[in-house]
């Protein structure tokens, strides 16, 4: 009885995995058919699935007039942390946006910091600057913001990624 139940669950799991693989392939085919996919995938280290999630969460890019709208949609804009006359030094991101988009950007930035020299330099610069150095997580948040601005510019101006354009050196 136990072996039969176990075999049934294994078969069900394998069937679901194959269904997920088919759905994932269909998603990637649809994503690659979009003209915006070319520009998003030109960023080294940004995978097709992550780029597809970002584009799916954003929707039609032509609806947005500037990168700040994408940033607000993701909920990664910094918000002042004040109460009355008190101003705390830490400025968190708002988190009032799409969590899935924020998560995709977070993992994309982690990968880019490891693989892209320009992002790695910018990450170090945020942490080591003399005035207002950022913690590791704050630097990642700032890079999420920067990545979304770059992606917006690539899609808006129909350009491929240039590691020296838009990042300080």
Regions found by a protein language model. Name each.
Residues 1-169:
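A detector of single, family-specific signature residues
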């Amino acid at each position: 009885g136990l072996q039969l139940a176990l075999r049934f669950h294994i078969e069900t799991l394998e069937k679901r995995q194959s269904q997920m693989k088919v759905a994932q392939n269909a998603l990637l085919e649809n994503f690659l058919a979009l003209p915006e996919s070319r520009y998003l995938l030109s960023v080294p280290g940004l995978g097709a699935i992550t780029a597809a999630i970002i584009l799916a969460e954003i929707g039609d890019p032509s609806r947005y007039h500037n990168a700040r709208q994408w940033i607000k949609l993701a909920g990664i804009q910094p918000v002042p942390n004040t109460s009355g006359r008190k101003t705390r030094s830490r400025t968190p991101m708002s988190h009032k946006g799409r969590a899935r988009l924020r998560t995709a950007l977070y993992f994309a930035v982690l990968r880019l910091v490891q693989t892209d020299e320009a992002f790695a330099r910018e990450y170090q610069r945020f942490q080591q600057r003399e005035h207002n150095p950022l913690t590791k997580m704050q630097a990642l948040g700032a890079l999420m913001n920067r990545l979304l601005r770059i992606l917006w510019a690539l899609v808006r101006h129909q350009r491929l990624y240039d590691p020296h354009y838009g990042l300080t050196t």
